[in-house]
Amino acid sequence: IREILKEEKIQEIIQSKDYNKGYKIVGNIPYYLTSYLLRLLMNLQSKQNKPKLVVLMVQKEVAERIVAQPPKMNLLAVLTQFYFQSKIIQIVKKGNFSPPPKVDSAIIKLIPLKNQYISNPKLEKKFIQLVKAGFSQPRKTLLNNLKTIIPKEKIEKYLLKNNLQLTIRPAALSLDDWLKIFQELVMN
């Protein structure tokens, strides 16, 4: 399956004439491929020929991580929400299947977003680097995680100016908070 899902193969398929007017991706994918497929879908967002809608059945716990909000934000949530409006449509209990799997499932709906960073590969890459650094050690403070890429004094000044505690953890920040941090600490 990974061979079929290689980004080059997907690009080849979607650049065919059948997909030039937009397309939707709908699937009940093997759960072990969820993060791999999400990364591919995120990579497609900066391309011209991207899906208009993605609907997937995934493991319930993964779906909950994708749509998480503060104080339960995580790397997957921030990045997915950067590219998509994300929503759980329905929970599918394991008892609805025969034989029943070990976990409950959820149907998620992902609608691609347009923002200034996705259309600029350099900014997109820098934003992703910022968020990855911020979540590099989720139990540590944002300040400790980001000081590897941004001077500590600059982070402290930003946090104080925006009435955020110096001990704030990355999970307490929304996507909007991350975008503001990016604008003020990385772009300036």
PLM features: residue spans?
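Short, locally clustered residues in the helix-turn-helix/winged-helix DNA-binding domain
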Residues: 42, 147, 186
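An accessory alpha-helical subdomain
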Residues: 96, 106, 110-112, 118-155, ...
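Residue-level marker of structural boundaries
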Residues: 71-72, 151, 164, 187
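Catalytic cores of RNA-modifying enzymes
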Residues: 1-132
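C-terminal beta-strand-rich structural cap/linker in extracellular carbohydrate-active enzymes
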Residues: 167, 171-188
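A structural signal for short hydrophobic/aromatic patches embedded in well-ordered alpha helices
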Residues: 66, 158-159, 181
